[in-house]
């Protein structure tokens, strides 16, 4: 080994004359990847490292949480963090459940000692409703400059990366993997099978296999590496083989459930006779048990395209062992000869040793063929969980072997076979879940029909299945004959578990006599699971299934419009359903679909309905019927007439927050903010004049009447919370006065950086200024360029067409395309903005509201010389128009950027604190 750390590994690879490449396919794109050499990766990582060090308080050796969903971002910032002398922590996907997500982030903050967190701006809202981890959007970093300062070096025993153990519903531990452990592991991985071509990965880099099975070994061997988004392959498994053939892949990874899906897809395409070349391909498989039959069938199918007989390599590995450490290179014939239902996991790499011990606690090994506790040791095995000495101590035997938590046996040939788990964890499609956490969430959800503390969650491997299924038995509160309550309870439980795991459970209501608690008030999970697998609950399961099916058929509901008809057809076709068993009111998870089916369904809807924007997976999970999904999608497709109210966020039970548009009339600026607010609905008021046949408001009075009526129609009773951004503050003030005059309580009035007196500024804004401000506001050009054009037009009165010509010529064409802005629409928008400004040229504030919160930032240069003078000389005048002392809140950013991605996290914390302080 010629290097002592990972930084040297990359530096060595980047220096090669013909170095390998990182090839990345973006989401939804399987045709046109990006490609960067290891030399280019090193250069970009050095720039990113410099940006990280200069823009943050990153300290040498401190943890940096990396939360990305694209392969390139994860790779780039992994190396940037290492080069900066920090320790990358690969963040897993956050739980969908709000309380679990908050608890997860709070746990990470404590465990990692308040880490920096890097992410993309579009992902920052995932960190809402908590304040312990503040995400930093990497778009805010200056990536164009860098220092000649070289990377920070590391010793072999230094921690290179922290990987989080599966914490989808439990509390993850941070596994410290050192440079030496990783290097030992990846060197040995290259000798398991002959690897002559590129590597391919399709799982996130927060999974240790993506890092230590694919990314780092590819760099070590100076081979290309191909990265594909998992959703694209799950939706179309045949693409996995096409890409492997196209790139002449030598090594990739796939768990058993995907191998089964791939087998079925290949069987369906055999008549097409594709000309694939899979010679030299090896698919390593782990994470869950490999069914011998599946390995045999897929091996034969792949063999038709030149794959070696042992193309499938089952194995055992954990985060704590740098992923795969034990491999079976004799699959499937080794297990076929022994008539084993599940494939053996093989023998150890040279850097790992394994043993099977008895339950005596004396580190006594059992004889070959006897079942016991699997323990491992070696240079690729971790030594500690970060900041968790008790878990570290529990993880090792008295003589220093790592306790894997698995039961197994080693046969007379030295091959490992697993025989279950010590801990009550469930593995569904290769992901671990805690049954305790699922039960807790169900209890906390207060589901009608479900008796609290009388539900038991476990997993089972049905005969002939490819992966385990989640089972949930519960004690119902409804009478046995109340079929409607039975259905509603089943639907609610199913929806909750699917949101947590992405997998549809088997749900069985049982009599209380079958759910006996111990003296300590506990249900015996092992006994209940054993009874289920013996068939003791089959009569209850069959009765429940029959009643549910009969109810669905009797209550079958036809589609009410074209969208529902279209969606129903897509559901039936995509999921291969019978129209007799499925209608617009049938929860899709009642049909036993998997997360893979859900991804495929999502893609089909987006393509066949020609929906421009991606449908969030949570939308499908939360809207489980065609009717619910139709309602959720309707606003995306229906143009409609002028409707001032835009629903930005519809969750939560607290007082709704009303946000009124700035001077450009649009509410897009509030989208980032609304994503962080989950405890109350967020509505925005949009100006009239954007529609093809709409005319702008003629006066402030008309605007206020319209907005007042819209608010009352949506929220008939107070208390109210109303805020406006810039120009919108004036409208928020006037609307709030109207509400108070009608006898309503307005508990919160917010001014986002606007003083009460605005007419002088309004008189300065002619059409040219409005158009240029709009162009800058929409990021069509820089503030500097907008100022230069304003100076060029100063003292003249150019026509609208001439100003528009200049703006279109100077506008960023990519941004124009993103916004789908035509010349005519931009002109219409500018006229709307000008109309709004014009109706305030004689505005003088009068009257008062009970209270006001003023959020202030760096003002426009024409408005004040400093933030302090802006507050003291201008914003302070709100005291004349409130019946109590206004509260002032200093926020980050400048007038046009206070709600931008780089500042919105801090802003929303301040805003939520202000709302809470007002008791609203």
Curated annotation (Swiss-Prot):
Keywords: Phosphopantetheine, Phosphoprotein, Transferase. Its EC number is 2.3.1.-. It catalyses: 2 3-(4-hydroxyphenyl)pyruvate + 2 ATP = atromentin + 2 AMP + 2 diphosphate + H(+). It is an enzyme of class 2 (transferase). Residues 558-637 form the Carrier domain. It holds the Pfam family PP-binding. GO terms for biological process: fatty acid biosynthetic process. The keyword Calcium does not apply. Residues 13-428 are annotated as: Adenylation (A) domain. GO terms for molecular function: transferase activity; very long-chain fatty acid-CoA ligase activity. Residues 656-905 are annotated as: Thioesterase (TE) domain. Belongs to the NRP synthetase family. AtrA has an A-T-TE domain architecture. The adenylation (A) domain recognizes and activates the aryl acid substrates, and loads them onto the thiolation (T) domain. The thioesterase (TE) domain shares the missing condensation (C) domain function, and is responsible for condensation and final product release. Nonribosomal peptide synthetase that mediates the biosynthesis of atromentin. AtrA first activates 4-hydroxyphenylpyruvate (HPPA) through its A domain to AMP-HPPA. The HPPA unit is then loaded to the T domain and eventually transferred to the TE domain. Another HPPA unit is then loaded onto the T domain. The TE domain then catalyzes the condensation of the two HPPA units and the release of atromentin via cyclization. This is Nonribosomal peptide synthetase atrA. It comes from Aspergillus terreus (strain NIH 2624 / FGSC A1156). The gene is atrA.
């Amino acid at each position: 080994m010629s290097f002592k750390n990972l930084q040297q590994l990359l530096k060595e690879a980047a220096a090669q004359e013909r170095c390998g490449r990182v090839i990345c396919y973006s989401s939804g794109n399987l045709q046109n990847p990006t490609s960067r050499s290891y030399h280019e990766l090193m250069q970009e990582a050095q720039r990113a490292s410099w940006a990280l060090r200069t823009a943050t308080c990153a300290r040498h050796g401190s943890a940096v949480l990396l939360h990305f969903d694209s392969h390139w971002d994860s790779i780039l910032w992994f190396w940037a963090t290492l080069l900066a002398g920090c320790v990358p922590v690969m963040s897993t996907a956050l739980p969908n459940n709000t309380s679990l997500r908050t608890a997860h982030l709070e746990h990470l903050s404590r465990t990692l000692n308040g880490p920096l967190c890097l992410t993309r701006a579009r992902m920052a809202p995932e960190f809402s409703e908590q304040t312990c981890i503040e995400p930093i959007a990497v778009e805010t970093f200056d990536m164009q400059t860098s220092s000649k300062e070289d990377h920070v070096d590391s010793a072999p025993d230094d921690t290179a990366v922290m990987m989080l153990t599966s914490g989808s519903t439990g509390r993850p531990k941070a596994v410290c993997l050192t440079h030496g452990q990783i290097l030992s592991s990846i060197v040995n991985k290259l000798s398991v099978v002959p690897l002559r071509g590129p590597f391919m990965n399709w799982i996130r880099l927060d999974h240790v296999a993506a890092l230590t099975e694919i990314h780092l070994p590819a760099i070590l061997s100076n081979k290309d590496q191909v990265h594909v988004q998992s959703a694209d392959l799950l939706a179309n498994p045949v693409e996995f083989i096409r890409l492997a053939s196209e790139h002449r892949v030598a090594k990739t990874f796939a768990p058993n459930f995907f191998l089964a899906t791939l087998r079925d897809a290949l069987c369906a395409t055999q008549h097409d006779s594709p000309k694939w070349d899979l010679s030299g391909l090896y698919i390593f498989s782990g994470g869950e048990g490999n069914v011998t039959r599946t390995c045999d069938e897929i091996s034969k199918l792949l063999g038709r395209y030149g794959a070696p007989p042992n193309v499938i390599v089952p194995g055992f590995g954990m985060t704590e062992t740098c992923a795969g450490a034990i491999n079976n290179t004799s699959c499937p014939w080794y297990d076929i000869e022994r008539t084993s239902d599940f494939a053996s996991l093989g023998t150890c790499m040279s850097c790992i040793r394994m043993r099977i011990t008895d339950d005596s606690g004396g580190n006594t090994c059992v004889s070959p063929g006897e079942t016991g506790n699997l323990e491992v040791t070696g240079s690729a095995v971790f030594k500690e969980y970060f900041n968790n000495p008790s878990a570290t101590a529990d993880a090792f035997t008295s003589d220093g072997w790592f306790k894997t938590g698995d039961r197994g046996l080693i046969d007379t040939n030295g091959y490992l076979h697993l025989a279950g788990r010590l801990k009550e964890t469930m593995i569904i499609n290769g992901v671990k879940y805690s049954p305790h956490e699922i039960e807790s969430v169900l209890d906390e959800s207060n589901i009608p029909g479900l008796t609290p503390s009388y539900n038991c969650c476990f997993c089972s491997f049905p005969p002939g299945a490819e992966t385990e299924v989640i089972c949930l038995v519960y004690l119902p509160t409804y009478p046995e004959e109340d079929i409607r309550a039975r259905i509603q309870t089943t639907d609610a439980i199913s929806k909750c578990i699917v949101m947590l795991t992405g997998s549809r459970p088997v749900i069985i209501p049982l009599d209380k006599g079958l759910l006996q608690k111990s003296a300590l008030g506990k249900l015996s999970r092992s006994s209940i699971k054993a009874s289920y697998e013996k068939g003791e609950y089959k009569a209850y399961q069959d009765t429940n299934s029959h009643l549910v099916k009969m109810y669905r058929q009797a209550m079958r509901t036809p589609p009410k419009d074209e969208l529902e008809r279209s969606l129903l057809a897509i559901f039936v076709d995509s999921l291969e359903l019978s129209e007799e068993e499925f209608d617009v009111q049938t929860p899709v998870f009642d049909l036993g679909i998997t997360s893979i089916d859900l991804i495929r369904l999502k893609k089909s809807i987006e393509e066949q309905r020609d929906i421009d924007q991606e449908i969030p997976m949570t939308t499908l999970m939360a809207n489980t019927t065609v009717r619910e999904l139709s309602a959720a999608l309707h606003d995306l497709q229906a143009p409609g007439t002028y409707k001032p109210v835009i629903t930005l966020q519809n969750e939560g039970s607290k007082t709704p927050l009303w946000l009124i548009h700035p001077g450009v009339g649009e509410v897009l600026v509030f989208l980032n903010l609304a994503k962080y607010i989950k405890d109350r609905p967020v509505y925005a008021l949009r100006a009239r004049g954007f529609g093809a046949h709409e005319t702008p408001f003629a006066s402030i009075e008309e605007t206020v009447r319209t907005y007042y009526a819209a608010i009352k129609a949506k929220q008939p009773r107070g208390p109210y919370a109303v805020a406006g951004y810039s120009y919108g503050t004036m409208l928020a003030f006037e609307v709030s006065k109207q509400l108070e005059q009608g006898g309503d309580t307005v508990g919160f009035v917010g001014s986002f950086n606007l003083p009460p007196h605005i007419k002088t500024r309004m008189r300065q804004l002619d059409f040219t200024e409005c158009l240029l401000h709009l162009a800058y506001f929409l990021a069509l050009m820089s503030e500097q360029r907008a100022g230069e054009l304003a100076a060029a037009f100063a003292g003249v009165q150019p026509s609208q067409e001439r100003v528009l010509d200049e703006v279109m010529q100077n506008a960023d064409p990519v941004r124009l395309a993103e916004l789908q802005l035509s010349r005519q629409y931009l002109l219409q928008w500018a006229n709307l903005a000008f109309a709004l400004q014009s109706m305030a040229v004689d505005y003088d504030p009068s009257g008062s509201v009970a209270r006001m919160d003023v959020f202030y930032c760096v003002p426009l240069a024409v408005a004040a010389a400093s933030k302090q003078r802006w507050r003291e000389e201008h914003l302070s005048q709100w005291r004349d128009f409130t019946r109590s002392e206004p509260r002032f809140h200093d926020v980050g950013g400048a007038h046009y950027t206070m709600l931008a991605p780089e500042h919105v996290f801090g802003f929303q914390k301040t805003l939520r604190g202000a709302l809470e302080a007002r008791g609203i």
